[in-house]
Amino acid sequence: MALASCNSPKSAGENPFFTQWDTPFGVPPFDKIRAEHFMPAFERGMSLHDAEIDAITSNNDEPTFENTILAYDNAGQMLAQTELIFGMLCAAETNERMQALQEQVMPLLSAHRDKIRLDEKLFARVKDVYDRRASLGLDAEQSRLLRKTYDAFVRSGALLDAGQKARLKEINGELSLTAVKFGNNILAENNNFALELTADDLEGLPSGVRDAAREKAQAMGKGDKWVFTLHKPSLIPLLTYSTKRDLREKIYKAYLNRCNNGDEYDNKQLINDFIRLRTEKAHLLGYPSYAAYVVADEMAGTTDAVYGLLDQIWEPALERAKGELSEMNTLLQKDIPGATFESWDWWYYAEKLRKQNYALDEEMLRPYFSLENVQGGIFYLANRLYGITFQPVVVPLYHPDAVAYQVLDADGSHLGVLYFDYFPRDGKSQGAWCGNYVEQTYKDGKRVAPVVSVVCNFTRPVGNTPALLTLDETETLFHEFGHALHFLFHDVKYRGLTEVEGDFVEERFGLVERQQRRGVAHRTGEVADDAHHGSDALAVPVGLFDIVAAPRPLTLAVTREEVEIEHAQMRLVGVEHLVGDRLRMIERRHDGLEGDLSLIHI
């Protein structure tokens, strides 16, 4: 990898952030970027940004949209570009050097942002334009940019007094470092755990799962073992298929107790710090809780609206969960009479219930969804719906696992570049996400195309067997691809208008995710072509399509779990009062659910 391949510092003149990129389609020159380039780039970026802000505040002309709002929107582009690349790489391909840089850089960036957003002269000019907005003859885009700019200053503390601003700066600096430490601790715990199994421990595991565990063991120099980790493609199959209840318990508890072991990676105090600092920040800014502060800038608007939706879903989801729990407990009693249903039993007996009640076998379906064919189905769907096409391109890559495509609009014009990075590794965070390495903007009246990346953690190919996706993984890929489409279709004049409310964004791309299920379910639908067997290129048989088309088992039970998680998150950020320096958390229990079922899913 480029960031780790060079140990000797480069001179400032060779820093790729200081030159115009001559790469295809303007993608970042990953083959030239080194870890040591980032700090000089951040320092220069902040210095240039300061100069651009000084030019605005020292302007003696009357504040206008052009000399204040637009000038502010255009400021800080080098810094923003450096932040994008650094942030994306810290999530997808980090190492100890990058993590150390994070801890050094994030407080500096926090202080820099606060200095600008709390600049009284700058805000006075922004407010002057905002107060006269009705008489300025602004078009719709200009009006929205003006409002978003003003609101961003207010939400950042521009209306606070000097003492409050000073405290807010301290809080933001602490929060920035706390967030970095928290994420790095999680990554370390994910990477530190390895469950070594022998041949006697493999009962119930499909051959593909065994092969992947064997390959991991060989990579670790433990060729006589089978190794399972806390990465989802390893963790979930063991929980789902292993007949060894003690092994399921061991890996489940290891995952659940990450950063909760009283060691150097323990996050309990960091969580307490998060809640304490966020609550104090919300109070400074005039909100009863951090949840109220966050939601005020989303479509929901208020915490009451959020709770109203969650409570509306909760009761029917809870009733369905109770019924399915009862069925799974019956299966458990047949295997182990008198046993108490535990969290680590959920995946195993949910799979048994799927087979028993719905004839749905994930392992039976999986061979028909090779990663290559699912990706082809995504491209096919996008072409049918939007007329866009995808062409493989040779561009600099930040890791050998990544692949890149040029995306062409229906008229053949360049829309952007799309990277895919599918497989887990030690330097990558868990989960799936989509982000930009280069944001869409306009320069000299011409559209600057975005460079977008979809990052996942799917099972790697093993030997001659391609990467085969579960239905959940297929839906994840469609969901993240929906975000990618959003970025690729961006065509806005102003940088400040590229962001969309988070709750709106997630719902939109839930629609793309659901389009996948409908398409797979209807063999004459748009994405039926993504369902070809990885080995013989045969379409999924009619009978299997009918199974997938049927109402999905356990959907509402999963919804119950998801709603409970949302409730828990709202409670964590909805704290209004703290007792001393310690937060006393009270776990809500629901009638009719016994045992630790608030954590039945991962």
Predicted regions and their residues:
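N-terminal helix-rich structural modules
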Residues: 11-206
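Short His/Asp/Glu-rich catalytic/ion-coordination signatures at enzyme active sites or charged loops
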Residues: 22-37, 86-105, 128-170, 229-269, ...
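Active-site recognition of the HExxH zinc-binding catalytic motif
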Residues: 472-487
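Conserved small/polar residues in nucleotide/adenosyl-binding loops
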Residues: 600-602
